[in-house]
Amino acid sequence: MSWQAYVDDHLMCDIEGHEGHRLTAAAIVGHDGSVWAQSATFPQFKPEEMNGIMTDFNEPGHLAPTGLHLGGTKYMVIQGEAGAVIRGKKGSGGITIKKTGQALVCGIYEEPVTPGQCNMVVERLEDYLLEQGL
C-alpha cells in the first residue's frame, strides 16, 4: 500500500458512525520534514514550523508559549502526551500530531468533527505504523 493510500483510506475516511464527517486535512511527514503523503487540503508548511514541532516532541512544552504554527496557521497547544502527541486548537477546529519511530501522523479538523474523533483517527493509524516498526 502506498503512503498516499494510508492518507486517503485511513485518515481522510468517514469518521466511524458519522457518515460524511471526516478530517479537513491530513498528512504523513518524515521526522526530517519530508512529506510522505498528504491530502490535497493539507497546508504547505515551512521547514521552521516542522522543526518547532519536532523540538516539542523532544522537549515537551517548547511550543506552549508561542503556539503551534503549521502552514501559517497558529494553534493554541493543549494537553498532549509528552514525546508522543501534540494537540492544538484554533476556533472550532484543531490539529492532532502523533509521532512514530520515523514519521509524524497529522490530522486537522473543523466542526462537526470533534477533537476526540480526530484523535481516534490519527491514533489508529499511528498505532498501526508502530506495530509495523515504522
From Swiss-Prot:
Coiled coil: none annotated. The keyword Disulfide bond applies. Keywords: Actin-binding, Allergen, Cytoplasm, Cytoskeleton, Disulfide bond, Phosphoprotein. CDD domains: PROF. It is found in: Cytoplasm, Cytoskeleton. One of its GO terms (cellular component) is cell cortex. The modification Phosphothreonine is found at T114. A motif (Involved in PIP2 interaction) lies at residues 84-100. InterPro entries: PFN, PFN_euk, PFN_sf, Profilin_CS. Gene3D superfamilies: Dynein light chain 2a, cytoplasmic. Pfam families: Profilin. GO terms for molecular function: actin monomer binding. Occurs in many kinds of cells as a complex with monomeric actin in a 1:1 ratio. Binds to actin and affects the structure of the cytoskeleton. At high concentrations, profilin prevents the polymerization of actin, whereas it enhances it at low concentrations. This is Profilin-1. It comes from Olea europaea (Common olive).
